[in-house]
């Protein structure tokens, strides 16, 4: 019997190619044009995006990227490449490709790379621990568009999410314990997830529940009293209500109420990026300290940590 060759496609959001206004504008144009991300009427959205948002936000966001850019490139790309390389080293007989929903390398190039290596079955692992229509479903949509152009399509196994997978929780818990060992146990552990519009949740996106699932399992694994852990949502965009409580407002409130030591983990980010390294590690640190807090640490994403790579090995094992 013919044995079909299996490959793994690691998918993530994407990043500008350079920390310049032009590169950021190209990236934001593609990202904010996806109806899975912003579902506003195109008649209203296009003029606003092209005439107001891109011209104003691109230079501002480029400066933020410049503050976290690494010698090898964008943090998200650097850590994603390291994940790809580490997983490939761990699974030498399984091709591993990296594709981004926006920017490069594209999901299309990742699929073509795997097909060129003789892969007949692709295990798609979107590196979003908690499902959302604006992230995981966007990967699904793009994958469908790519395969619609192929005469012969490969078999596909699509991993929807892994919010409460034991290996993911184990890796998160280990990273928290390591931070506690270095900095001491904080008064409060804040779990900050990327937000989505509240309307998306009202319409059936189960993202908030998947965040609660991760929080519940992590608190249990750490053995912390529930009152010493809070779950918040960051990175809101636009004027409509997003999931609450908001991370920045919560940190301000905690500082004002006398909380002195906080550590922040972002369980929804598989790799460090602008939203963690700048928004959480810098901006929100300032918010907390200016409100009266005294000690604040950001716990890094799992990135290419050994336990994270082992999770990917075990998560994809049933499909290989």
Curated annotation (Swiss-Prot):
GO terms for cellular component: cytoplasm. Pfam families: Ferrochelatase. The keyword GTP-binding does not apply. CDD domains: Ferrochelatase_C, Ferrochelatase_N. Pathway: Porphyrin-containing compound metabolism; protoheme biosynthesis; protoheme from protoporphyrin-IX: step 1/1. Fe cation binds at residues 194, 275. Transmembrane segments: none annotated. Keywords: Cytoplasm, Heme biosynthesis, Iron, Lyase, Metal-binding, Porphyrin biosynthesis. It is an enzyme of class 4 (lyase). Its main location: cytoplasm. GO terms for biological process: heme biosynthetic process. The keyword Cytoplasm applies. GO terms for molecular function: ferrochelatase activity; metal ion binding. Signal peptide: none annotated. It catalyses: heme b + 2 H(+) = protoporphyrin IX + Fe(2+). It comes from the Bacteria. Its EC number is 4.98.1.1. It is found in: Cytoplasm. Belongs to the ferrochelatase family. Catalyzes the ferrous insertion into protoporphyrin IX. This is Ferrochelatase. It comes from Klebsiella pneumoniae (strain 342).
């Amino acid at each position: 019997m013919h044995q079909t060759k299996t490959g793994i496609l690691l998918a993530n959001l994407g990043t500008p190619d350079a920390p310049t206004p032009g590169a950021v504008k190209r990236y934001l144009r593609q990202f904010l044009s996806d109806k899975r991300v912003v579902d506003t009427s195109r008649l209203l959205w296009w003029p606003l995006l092209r005439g107001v948002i891109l011209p104003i936000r691109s230079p501002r966001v480029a400066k933020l990227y410049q503050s976290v850019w690494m010698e090898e490139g964008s943090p998200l790309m650097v850590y994603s490449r390291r994940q790809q390389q580490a997983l490939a080293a761990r699974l030498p007989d399984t091709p591993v490709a990296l594709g981004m929903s926006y920017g490069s390398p594209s999901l299309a190039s990742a699929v073509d790379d795997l097909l060129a290596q003789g892969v007949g079955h692709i295990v798609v692992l979107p590196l979003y621990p908690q499902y959302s229509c604006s992230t995981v479903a966007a990967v699904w949509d793009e994958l469908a568009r790519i395969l619609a152009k192929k005469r012969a399509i490969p078999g596909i196994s699509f991993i929807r999410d892994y919010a409460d997978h034991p290996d993911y929780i184990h890796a998160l818990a280990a990273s928290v314990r390591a931070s506690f060992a270095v900095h001491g146990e904080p008064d409060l552990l804040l779990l900050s997830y990327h937000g989505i519009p509240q309307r998306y949740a009202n319409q059936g996106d189960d993202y908030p529940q998947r965040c609660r699932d991760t929080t519940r399992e992590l608190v249990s694994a750490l053995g912390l009293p529930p009152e010493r852990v809070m779950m918040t949502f960051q990175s809101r965009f636009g004027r409509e209500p997003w999931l609450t409580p908001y991370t920045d407002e919560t940190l301000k409130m905690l500082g004002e109420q006398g909380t002195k030591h906080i550590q922040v983990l972002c369980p929804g980010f598989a790799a460090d990026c602008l939203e963690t390294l700048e928004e959480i590690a810098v901006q929100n640190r300032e918010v907390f300290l200016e409100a009266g807090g005294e000690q604040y640490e950001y716990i890094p994403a799992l990135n290419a940590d050994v336990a994270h790579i082992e999770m990917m090995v075990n998560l994809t094992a049933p499909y290989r």
